[in-house]
């Protein structure tokens, strides 16, 4: 009789423990299956007139594909060399460079099955070789979802730079977003 009672008690506790594990598992899995993902974003492109842009950012997606982006940006503007008359390494790398750190809010304006589009509104603060440069950024970004959380995107951007050599920067950037867990 004792063996039967022990077996019944053991089965009861095993069933209870199994039920607790199933409940915890379902609660945790559904808690992780959302759109609130962080992504590492790397993009490069060309800006008018004779400018090149590299942006590395962390994007935090909120509800309905809206997002916050925290970015670091490097800008290079090249010019023709005065001695040789065309672009040489010195006139390319040493003409005008800026860097900046900033944030942008990206409300979603277009949603589709495997893509979405966001407005990009933000600001930055950085430096060139001589002083402080501030920026007001506006544009449009369209992202396409790939497998395993990867995304590719293109971005049309316009920057109003305060205190720099360029007042307006307009161009196109393409890049990739890598999921961060």
Label each residue range with its predicted role.
Residues 1-37, 180-181:
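Cleavable N-terminal export/targeting peptides
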Residues 12, 17-18, 41, 62, ...:
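Small/flexible residues
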Residues 42-55, 93-97, 125-136, 160-169:
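Solvent-exposed loop/turn segments connecting transmembrane beta-strands
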Residues 59-152, 178-181:
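Gram-negative (and chloroplast) outer-membrane scaffold detector with strong preference
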Residues 8, 16, 21-22, 66, ...:
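A periodicity- and composition-biased signal for non-globular, repetitive helical segments
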Residues 27, 34, 39-41, 96-98, ...:
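Compositionally biased, low-complexity repeat tracts
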Residues 31-78, 171, 177-181:
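Short glycine/proline- and aromatic-enriched beta-strand/turn motifs that initiate or cap beta-hairpins
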Residues 155-156:
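Internal, hydrophobic beta-strand segments that form the core of beta-sheet-rich folds
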């Amino acid at each position: 009789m004792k063996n039967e009672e022990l077996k019944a008690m053991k089965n009861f506790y095993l069933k209870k423990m199994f039920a607790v594990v199933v409940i915890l598992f379902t609660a945790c899995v559904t808690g992780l299956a959302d759109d609130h993902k962080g992504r590492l974003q790397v993009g490069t492109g060309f800006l008018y007139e004779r400018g090149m842009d590299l942006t590395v950012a962390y994007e935090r997606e909120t509800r309905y594909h809206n997002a916050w982006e925290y970015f670091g940006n490097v800008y290079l503007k090249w010019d023709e060399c005065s001695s040789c008359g065309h672009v040489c390494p010195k006139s390319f790398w040493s003409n005008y460079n800026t860097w900046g750190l900033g944030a942008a809010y990206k409300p979603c304006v277009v949603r589709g099955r495997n893509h979405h589009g966001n407005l990009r509104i933000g600001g930055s603060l950085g430096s060139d070789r001589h002083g402080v440069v501030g920026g007001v950024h506006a544009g449009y970004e369209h992202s396409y979802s790939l497998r395993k959380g990867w995304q590719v995107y293109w971005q049309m951007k316009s920057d109003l730079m305060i205190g720099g050599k360029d007042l307006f920067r307009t161009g196109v950037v393409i890049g990739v977003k890598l999921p961060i867990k």
